[in-house]
Amino acid sequence: MISVGIVGGTGYTGVELLRILLRHPKAQVRVLTSRTEAGKPVADMFPNLRGHTDLQFSDLNIDALKECDVVFFATPHGVAMQHAKDLIAAGTKVIDLAADFRLQNLEQFEKWYGMEHACPDVLKDSVYGLTELNREKIKQAQVIGNPGCYPTTVQLGLAPLLKSAQALIETKNIIIDAKSGVSGAGRKASLGMIYSENADNFKAYGVAGHRHHPEIVEALENIAGKKDVFEGLLFVPHLVPMIRGMLSTIYVDLTEAGKQTDLQALYENFYANEKFVDVMPANSSPETRSVRGANELRIALYKPQPNKLIILAAQDNLVKGASGQAVQNMNLMFGFNEDEGLQGIGLLP
């Protein structure tokens, strides 16, 4: 049994981590911090956890966190990097659900997140936690940068094409049209997230530039093993009036080799042994409700024209897009079965 700390337990990803870890047979949450709710029983804030835990929120105490085997940071950007060096020096592993360890390019990080990185030496040795694509590195990691929710759908949606020995798609004109529920914006109060602003409404945001764009580009370059080939990539996220769920629609142009390839078979073979990636039959329509509460991502392919491919990827943004994938990474880091604590089935209807 490993001991776990969660920094930032009152946000959506923090409480989702707790919900998942309370069912984990080999992990016990011992520290759960909050800047504003120290001393309050968790079940008083989240009644779904009544009868499942007697934990109370506490102030952040670095010495208490050092006693844990692993610490998750479900915090705003910039928090994990302030504490990562002290924790790993004490032998504690770190999994950050914010962006502190996602981008290896410091210039891009500072541009998009508006802060100087506090520990570039730790960043250099950290591992990007897209589980299905970085499994062996994750097993050896001390610090994990958990991927963003949108980048998870994009990478898993495109990886079979980019990993192929042949160039199957034109990489300079990829279009990603992505939609997310409002929980992706976090739990803090803001005008744009209140009910009357989102109910009966559907809008694009971050059209001029979104923080996940450089993460997507850097990650795709690493998958493809090529630099500067995704300059023309377009990424537009949208907010839909639901709490959980994410659907990315990815449009690509096929090369001559791509036109001749059985792309359905390519995807099915690529993900044949993956427990959390479901390749649906061709021309299916993955629904967000089918993965609600589950650590699964469903993919479907359409080929509307000989030289066009549409990839649909659906996930729960709080689970496979955040906390579930973080626990998946924890399992690898400690030699557990990858699906420990993650066998939950999506809630439908």
Curated annotation (Swiss-Prot):
Pathway: Amino-acid biosynthesis; L-arginine biosynthesis; N(2)-acetyl-L-ornithine from L-glutamate: step 3/4. Belongs to the NAGSA dehydrogenase family. Type 1 subfamily. This is N-acetyl-gamma-glutamyl-phosphate reductase. Disulfide bonds: none annotated. Transmembrane segments: none annotated. SMART domains: Semialdhyde_dh (SM00859). GO terms for biological process: L-arginine biosynthetic process. Catalyzes the NADPH-dependent reduction of N-acetyl-5-glutamyl phosphate to yield N-acetyl-L-glutamate 5-semialdehyde. Its main location: cytoplasm. The gene is argC. It comes from Acinetobacter baumannii (strain ATCC 17978 / DSM 105126 / CIP 53.77 / LMG 1025 / NCDC KC755 / 5377). It catalyses: N-acetyl-L-glutamate 5-semialdehyde + phosphate + NADP(+) = N-acetyl-L-glutamyl 5-phosphate + NADPH + H(+). The lineage of its organism: Bacteria, Pseudomonadati, Pseudomonadota, Gammaproteobacteria, Moraxellales. Keywords: Amino-acid biosynthesis, Arginine biosynthesis, Cytoplasm, NADP, Oxidoreductase. Its EC number is 1.2.1.38. PROSITE patterns: ARGC. SUPFAM superfamilies: Glyceraldehyde-3-phosphate dehydrogenase-like, C-terminal domain (SSF55347), NAD(P)-binding Rossmann-fold domains (SSF51735).
